[in-house]
């Protein structure tokens, strides 16, 4: 599927305001522009910023000859409890604020201009014991494809063994057909698929991904007129009486627990800021990162791959002190929202 970034053309305003929103470029941290007061409900945990709810808007234009194509919106991170509206209809609700999610646009689109609105909540203070930011703080993109295409997230790569070096590449498609796969240094292979096919590949003289040398391979998958490109490292992980092992070798974890904010940029997920963060940690002697206290961005995971830094993904931790935050607890768990 083809990814089109939707980073420009947005406006943002407080939910309920009647004045036009101000133009913003994504990723955008709306909380960063709010006043800081001693009476802020979040207090020291959120830097004394006040909390508000926000409404983002932009136009999504779809040519008539592409209306029958697949259109899927991806939001990499919206803080929090996002509502997505297309042409006045509620297309999705996403509780939590740190996981990416997808919205199938098919039932709501029309040829020509479409009104896209996203509501992000943050007035329910206090809702965090760290600076969360607010709004569309990670990238948004539109995935499109014709009838025959590789499914979104339809390429999965797994290291089976190191001696011999074998990887398993699983490809899922929207229809039967021929799948072509190319991995650098290996001959091109093709297989007929009924919608899902597996390519077991042996890599001679494989270059392993290690904490000293982050060797990465590039995999290109083609199906009909569609294409997907993924990178992967040859590595195995384990845990036993000798502790953590990587590629069968014991590794002493020298890790840091880092939050998703980027200092003066607030919660904005800027690729250069993320790269700088990982680079500085590696230069200081760290070899691992744990995302605190929630799933991190795709940008951070990719940078860890490039910088030979192991990564541990936190799922969720909420609360404003040592006790669970009743607002988030009720929304996510009692209400069955999940994460």
Residue positions per predicted region:
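Accessory beta-strand-rich segments of carbohydrate-active enzymes
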Residues: 3-16, 30, 46, 51-150, ...
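Short strand-coil-strand connectors
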Residues: 15, 76, 87, 182-186, ...
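Active-site-adjacent substrate/metal-binding segments within catalytic domains
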Residues: 35-62, 66-74, 79-85, 92-95, ...
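Hydrophobic residues in beta-strands and at strand termini
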Residues: 6, 26, 60-62, 75, ...
């Amino acid at each position: 599927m083809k990814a089109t970034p939707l980073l420009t053309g947005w406006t943002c305003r407080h939910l309920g305001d009647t004045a036009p929103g101000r133009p913003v470029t994504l990723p955008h941290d709306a909380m960063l522009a709010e006043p800081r007061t001693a009476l802020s409900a979040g207090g020291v945990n959120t830097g004394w910023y006040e909390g508000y709810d926000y409404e983002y808007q932009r136009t999504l234009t779809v040519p008539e000859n592409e209306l029958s194509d697949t259109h899927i919106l991806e939001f990499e991170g919206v803080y929090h409890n996002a509502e997505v509206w297309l042409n006045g209809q509620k297309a999705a609700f996403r509780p939590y604020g740190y996981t990416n999610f997808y919205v199938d646009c098919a039932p709501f689109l029309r040829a020509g201009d479409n009104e896209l609105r996203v509501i992000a909540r943050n007035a329910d203070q206090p809702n965090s014991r760290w600076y969360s930011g607010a709004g569309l703080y990670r990238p948004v993109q539109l995935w499109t494809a014709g009838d025959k295409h590789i499914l979104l997230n339809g390429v999965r790569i797994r290291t089976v063994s190191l001696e011999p070096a074998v990887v398993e590449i699983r490809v899922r498609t929207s229809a039967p057909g021929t799948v072509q796969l190319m991995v650098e240094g290996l001959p091109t292979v093709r297989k007929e698929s009924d919608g899902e096919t597996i390519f077991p590949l042996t890599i001679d003289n494989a270059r392993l991904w290690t904490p000293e040398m982050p060797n990465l391979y590039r995999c290109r998958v083609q199906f009909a007129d569609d294409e997907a490109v993924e990178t992967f490292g040859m590595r195995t992980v384990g845990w036993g009486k000798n502790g953590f092992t990587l590629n069968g070798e014991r590794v002493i974890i020298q890790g840091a627990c880092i939050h998703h904010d980027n200092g003066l940029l607030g919660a904005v997920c800027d690729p250069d800021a993320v790269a700088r963060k990982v680079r500085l940690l590696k230069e200081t002697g760290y070899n691992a990162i744990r995302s605190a206290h929630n799933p991190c961005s795709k940008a951070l995971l990719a940078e860890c791959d490039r910088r030979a830094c192991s990564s541990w993904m936190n799922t969720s931790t909420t609360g404003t002190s040592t006790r669970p935050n009743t607002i988030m607890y009720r929304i996510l768990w009692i209400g069955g929202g999940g994460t």
